[in-house]
Structures are given as structure tokens and as C-alpha cells.
A protein has these predicted regions:
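N-terminal Rossmann-like NAD(P) cofactor-binding subdomain of oxidoreductases
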Residues: 1-171
Length: 173
């Protein structure tokens, strides 16, 4: 399997690398993509060095089976067709596609079968607090039907990216 990570230089991109390694995700080839600022950086994965390629509108995704994308919603929207046009499955970590009816919103522990119906070649995932909640709710639902859930959450500043984190740090007295 040929795998790509888009946004590899960010915190989530680095977490993708860590989890893929930790879970011994089967892959024959890995391709890393990033912004013009990140292009040229080198990362080590499973003892091999990989150089980040600049994400561009070209055919770089031809032959790639799956792309894990975490480069912000604007980038996801802009590069959706570039990533999927040759059959690559785009697993997007941003909020860009969460409300699109033709993009499945998948939490593997809850609704993995929904990932099989992806007319646009894109799979989205919910917000991080939602993921944790629906995994727990699924276990309860399996025991007894849930009629209603009322939820309030506090969102982490990290979800808004590095700029928001820096702003948050400046605002703390």
C-alpha cells in the first residue's frame, strides 16, 4: 500500500507518523507533503528518511492508495480533486467536509462500514471531543437504546492550529 501524509510538519501530521508506526500500519511506500515552507524537510520513519514534497496541483497522488490530510480546511477543499482524481482515498482531519452529505463522517469504532461509501473519495472525521463521546455512546447504545443526549464541550485552542496556540499563550497572564 502506498500512503501519503499531507501536512506532515504540523502536530497532527507528526501524530499520523507516530500512530502509523506504533500500529505497524502496512505500507510499501510513504510520501510526505507540506507547504512551500515545509518542503525539503526530512523526517525519519521506520529507519528510513523521507523528504517533504511541496503540495501542488499536479499528478503526485497518482498511484497513492490513501492520503491522511491535516493541513487545514482551506487546503483540504482546494486540493480535494488533486488528491482524489486518480483514485486516492482522502482521509481528512479538518472540518472542511463534515457537513457534506456525500462525504461519510466516520469514527472507525462506531461506523466503519460508512467508509466504504465515499462517492467523492473523501472520508471525514468528527471533531475530537465528538469522537470520544460517540465511542462511549456506542457502547451504551449497544446495551440500551439512547433517546437523547445533551452535551456541552470546551474546545482546545490547539484545534485552531499553531497561530491560535501562540495567541492563547500570549493571552495568559
Amino acid at each position: 500500500m502506498k500512503v501519503a501524509i499531507v501536512g506532515v510538519s504540523g502536530a497532527v501530521g507528526q501524530e499520523f507518523l507516530r500512530v502509523l508506526d506504533q500500529r505497524n500500519f502496512p505500507m510499501d511506500e510513504l510520501v510526505l507533503f507540506g507547504s512551500s515552507r515545509s518542503a525539503g524537510r526530512v523526517y525519519t520513519f521506520r529507519g528510513k528518511q523521507y523528504t517533504v514534497k511541496e503540495l501542488k496541483h499536479n499528478d503526485d497522488f497518482k498511484g497513492i492508495d490513501v492520503a491522511f490530510v491535516s493541513a487545514g480546511g482551506g487546503t483540504s477543499k482546494e486540493f480535494e480533486k488533486t488528491i482524489t482524481k486518480h483514485g486516492t482515498v482522502m482521509i481528512d482531519n479538518s472540518s472542511a467536509f463534515r457537513m457534506d452529505e456525500d462525504v461519510p463522517l466516520v469514527v472507525p469504532e462506531v461506523n466503519p462500514e460508512d467508509a466504504l461509501n465515499r462517492p467523492r473519495g473523501v472520508i471525514a472525521n468528527p471533531n475530537c471531543t465528538t469522537i470520544q463521546m460517540v465511542v462511549a455512546l456506542k457502547a451504551i447504545e449497544n446495551l440500551s437504546h439512547i433517546k437523547r443526549v445533551h452535551v456541552s464541550t470546551y474546545q482546545a485552542a490547539s484545534g485552531a492550529g499553531a497561530t491560535a496556540m501562540a495567541e492563547d499563550r500570549k493571552s495568559v497572564v
